[in-house]
């Protein structure tokens, strides 16, 4: 009998914990047809190509047939004079490299949070941050690496990270000065787990191609639901456009990257790798 009571109490406790974890929830959707994603041609880079039995597409826009939109970063808009108290997350924000792609495609972090860069591949990648407000970094990871720590970010900023070895590799980083942010999953849903005080807020949904959408929301008893709708007509450019001119440059911290300049181009509806242009 005691065991049953204990198990029931545990179940209730687990339910409360799960409920308490989800403070602000919602969904991001796309109104209209999503831009067609180009296939990435890795055929000239064997170590990359061998890891993908199926074609890999540019992941600038990841949307389902229902319009569920991934990689939307939702955050509380910090109005002038607003105080948003919150602890720096204890877990590190991790950017991984696997199969010659970045994961996650959009990394979010708070000022002061530990940052770790991983490489699951057994060959060279170069991690090149195109930041301006925060100190940029540019280093090579020549073999599998379970985690290289870099200095925590110090300033709010959004910037790109690229690989100078595999020019199609592109990720975004968004840095906040509060912990009230989350990124939508493939089903479009997101969950901000940091506890936000009750009140009226403006929430911002950001997507690299569709820009920003603002929504008002009321947090009551620690809970709120805020949904975002992006218009496909607001796409800044074809998803692979930014990847057409990605220069490969040498860097003192990555001697193996010293090679002639290479570019990513489109051909036959594919995004080509550095050597494929010659075919």
Predicted regions and their residues:
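Compositionally biased, low-complexity segments enriched in small residues
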Residues: 1, 14-15, 259, 263
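Bacterial N-terminal signal peptides that target proteins for export
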Residues: 1-8
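Extracytoplasmic copper-binding redox domains, predominantly the cupredoxin/blue-copper superfamily
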Residues: 21-279
